[in-house]
Amino acid sequence: SCFNCKDFIKTADPDIILMNPPYNAKPIGIPDTYKVNWGKAKDGKEDPTKGLVFVHYLSDIVEEMNVEREVAGKARKTVKMAVLLPVAAAIGNKNIIQSEKIALLENNTLEAVFTLPNEIFYPGASASACCMVFTLGEPHIRADGTLHETFFGYFKEDGFKKKKYLGRVEQFDENGNSKWKAIEEEWLDVFRNHLSKDGLSATAKVTGEDEWLCEAYMKTDYTTLREDDFQQTLNNYLAYLLKEGKIYES
């Protein structure tokens, strides 16, 4: 567990961290200091922060490193982090998740959140995921009281298709060109330039009390909507209800 690796992390003195924490870690393995306000959830079966507590832990290590740097007369440093989390962590309408989000922005900046394709981990876990990008060690609220602007990407269609036994397979157009390559270039362009594009991206100044998903801020591109889109949404919702046992096939 990373909770036992603080000395290793401090010695490594990272500039970039890539992390994919467990979405449903058992609370028993999480340090008590992070569970003070969890109530009954601290004795539950799943991490009520949906993985945000792991980000909080690494953030605390970076802050500890910066305090030590200041004592030694050195400049503070920042660390870039990209972390995969379930979308539930970004929505954060439950008190425990919202408290984690608020705490995270005290010492760190939320640079970007990307909503990822459905079943991105196929044929593995079926969780709906997003990627959050933080600058650890730099408060989200500037010294003058203004907020950093966050980029939000609705990156659901990446040009891959699910294939049984093969996973998600890259697709090509009639000329043999990779569909993903063209999509990747567009995604990088809107992100690097903080562009707002209907149906794809948006920027917003958010706090820990807000939703951290593009769907809450982007404008819909109605010119691309088809009847099939509505049918697909209904089909997905029906599949979800069946999976959760809320309805049953007769």
What residues fall within each predicted segment?
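A conserved structural/catalytic subdomain of Rossmann-like adenosyl-cofactor enzymes
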Residues: 11, 15-250
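S-adenosyl-L-methionine
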Residues: 1-11
